UniProtKB/Swiss-Prot annotation:
Any one annotated GO CC term: mitochondrial outer membrane
Gene that encodes it: MCR1
Catalysed reaction equations from the record: 2 Fe(III)-[cytochrome b5] + NADH = 2 Fe(II)-[cytochrome b5] + NAD(+) + H(+)
Protein name (record): NADH-cytochrome b5 reductase 2
Main location as per UniProt: mitochondrion
Domain of life: Eukaryota
GO biological process: ergosterol biosynthetic process
Bilayer topology annotation: Single-pass membrane protein
SUPFAM superfamilies, alphabetized: Ferredoxin reductase-like, C-terminal NADP-linked domain (SSF52343), Riboflavin synthase domain-like (SSF63380)
Family: Belongs to the flavoprotein pyridine nucleotide cytochrome reductase family.
Entries under CDD domains matching the protein: cyt_b5_reduct_like
TM ranges: 12-29
Entry binding sites for FAD: 154-189
Length: 296
């Protein structure tokens, strides 16, 4: 019996070798699958511009529209992560490139299309061009550019301060976190606008708050209330935040996005896309540190 066992053991290295080879093959196949799977993403982070046609234009307010673009393939996703943006470009009649960053509001997992919510600025070169387009016209895009790579449960809570179209990257965060059953991060959004009609993505935000009432808390602020508006009238004040928002803590991260005057008032401006600059304004006065505040 012992002799038989001894003879059978001599095949053990061969068996182990075959097993190791099988594992190695599986790993290689998995890697190849991952690489091949990248083709299901429209944007791969390279330097290639992709022309996407407009398939739908929806008016959201007197100066804001939602543009829906078709991705190159119906089974593709955009390739963006939370939180990231893409670059949009058009070429002027004289051959100059006009490039602007935009944060899609469509879900990262949405196939075949991508949505942008854009506000028209009277002297804005890109927005004036975009608002002059119609369905089937194309816009060039490339990216994505990662601004902040969100990791579930990195914080107990996040505080979001936004105004106008600054809601776009904030909505991306709210939607991504709330719809992830594994992410328990509490969300506190304070969103300011001129009138109730100017509140962008309100139905989407309200639906998330209704669906996840224990996780998502949203407070709207308007300069002038009308009708049955549910929210606050006036600015998002220092006093309001000191009493209602989560206290400064390493367990609470703040994200800010809005027009320049808004950024100046609450966090101070960014120096550049790569340089957050110093933390000033209301958040600094409330005791938040630079490491606890991110400016989109």
């Amino acid at each position: 019996m012992f002799a038989r066992l001894s003879r059978s053991n001599k095949f053990l290295p061969i068996a182990l070798g075959v097993g190791a080879a099988s594992i190695a093959t599986a790993i290689i196949l998995q890697r190849n699958y991952s690489i091949m799977n990248d083709t299901s993403k429209a944007f791969l982070g390279d330097n290639e511009w992709i022309d996407l046609p407009i398939i739908k234009i929806e008016k959201l307010s007197h100066d804001t529209k939602r543009f829906t673009f078709a991705l190159p393939k119906k089974d593709q996703v955009s390739g963006l992560i939370t939180a990231s943006c893409i670059l949009a470009k058009f070429v002027t009649p004289k051959g100059s490139n006009v490039i602007r960053p935009y944060t899609p509001v469509s879900d990262n997992g949405t196939k075949g299309k991508m949505e942008l919510v854009v506000k028209h600025y009277e002297n804005g070169k890109f927005t004036s061009h975009l608002f002059g387009l119609k369905e089937n016209d194309t816009v060039s895009f490339k990216g994505p550019i990662t601004k902040w790579e969100w990791k579930p449960n990195s914080y107990d809570s996040i505080t979001l301060l936004g105004a106008g179209t600054g809601i776009n990257p904030l909505y991306q965060l709210v939607h991504h976190i709330a719809e992830n059953p594994e992410d328990n991060t509490k969300i506190h959004l304070y969103y300011g606008n001129k009138t109730p009609e100017d509140i962008l993505l309100k139905s989407e935000l309200d639906n998330l708050q209704k669906k996840y009432p224990d996780q998502v808390k949203i407070t709207y602020f308007v300069d002038k209330a009308e009708g049955n508006f549910e929210g606050e009238t006036g600015f998002i004040t220092k006093d309001y935040l000191s009493h209602q928002a989560p206290k400064p803590s390493e367990k609470n991260q703040v994200f800010v996005c809005g027009p320049p005057p808004f950024m100046k008032a609450y966090s101070g401006p960014k120096v550049s896309p790569q340089d957050q600059g110093e933390l000033t304004g209301i958040l600094a006065e409330l005791g938040y540190s630079k490491s606890n505040v991110f400016k989109f």
